[in-house]
Amino acid sequence: LAQGLQNGLILDHIGASLRRILFALLLAAPPAWALGLMAGRIKLAETLLSPIMYLLHPLPKVAFLPILMLLLGLGDGSKIALMGLVVFGQLFMAARDSAKAIAPPLVDSVRSLGCRSWGIFRWVIAPATLPSLISALRVSLGTSIAVLFLSETFASMDGLGWYIMDAWSRVNYPDMYAAILALALLGLSLYLILDALESLALRWREVG
């Protein structure tokens, strides 16, 4: 691993994998949260969206990889979309369920103080759903890394998944183990960053 870091080779593959993970999170998390909140608070939205999620969510996301490759090509697009499907489904379910679980008297009490729809979302719904959302994001992050490894072994020339399989096929076990360690450290770094963001976003839980 140290040798790969020194010559910069493994850094290129770490960068490729990290780029795909971050793009998938940035593209999937905001709409998943927004639509999940809508489904949790608006009956019509739940009626329209929940059956679709019930149909698609149980399917193994890797089953969509051939379809995504046909539609988006063999580049980053199909890999990012595959991870995005993983993130979207889990965050949508978490946001919807946590929004539905908010006690109506809590919302009514805030509304009685003159708080309008945006204020209710800002001060009640969003904070109440954030803990579940971050927990789901933590789970989906691990699943996304596993899916990333699989997707990078198909028609790819970079990324830690490709590097691991390439080293294995060349019987270069030191490089293979170095790439596996790099993938584990990448996941650890992302989890630590998520923990730090959780502490910042949920500081109100420590009050009192």
Predicted features along the sequence, with ranges:
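Periplasmic/extracellular loop-to-transmembrane helix junction in inner-membrane transport proteins
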Residues: 1-26
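Alpha-helical membrane-protein architecture signal
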Residues: 7, 11, 15, 45-49, ...
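Transmembrane-helix boundary motif in ABC transporter permease subunits
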Residues: 23-53
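Generic hydrophobic transmembrane alpha-helix motif, especially the helices
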Residues: 54-90, 97-98
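Transmembrane alpha-helices
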Residues: 81-85, 117-150, 178, 182-183, ...
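Short cytoplasmic-facing helical segments at TM-TM junctions of multi-pass membrane proteins
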Residues: 94-139, 160, 164
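Hydrophobic alpha-helical transmembrane segments of polytopic membrane proteins
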Residues: 161-198
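Short cytosolic juxtamembrane segments of multi-pass membrane proteins
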Residues: 198-208
